[in-house]
Amino acid sequence: MKIIAVTLREENVPAAFPFEARHYITDDFLRLADRCGVLLLPILSHREPGRLAARCDGLIVTGSNTHIPPWYYGEGPEDQASPADEYCLDRDLILEFAGENKPVLGICAGLQAMNAAFGGTLVRDLPNHDFTDRETHPVTVEPDTFLAGLYGPGIHAFNSFHTQAAGRVAPGFAVTARSAD
């Protein structure tokens, strides 16, 4: 059975309940892992990311309900209010797994974290892009890409609730799909 490391995200807990902090992963990841016959290994610690990368078969960097701070991709000072540990852990894991030539899948903010970890930037705030009032929107899949192999090139409906996006694409990365905005 393959072992896939997966990042967890911290649930927003009121300051009045500091001992109630929780970390989570969405049910979709659990169902998919079950269907694929893989074991998910939840990661919370910065301890020995190199050993972790050597022992696991891949990494999933999940999305987050917080913005990736500008300092993470070299465009601003460190913001004390940002979840630094979360994004530093993402970067450490991404670089270690990539260094081991292990597959890394970034989903939502996880993909944005991958782009930034390898030298790309982000668009900090997408206006009018909190599409919680609809399930999908049109996205154009580029030809001759992995995504085109799954869905075919052209326009497809995908869900997207992002308020940030890749800006400058990291060296060695390629855009596989685009939204009109």
Predicted regions and their residues:
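Conserved G/P- and acidic residue-centered "switch" motifs that form tight phosphate/ATP-binding loops
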Residues: C108
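Hydrophobic, aromatic-enriched interface-forming segments
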Residues: L111-M114
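N-terminal beta1-alpha1 cap of cysteine-dependent amidohydrolase-like domains
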Residues: M1-L105, F118, V123, P127-I155, ...
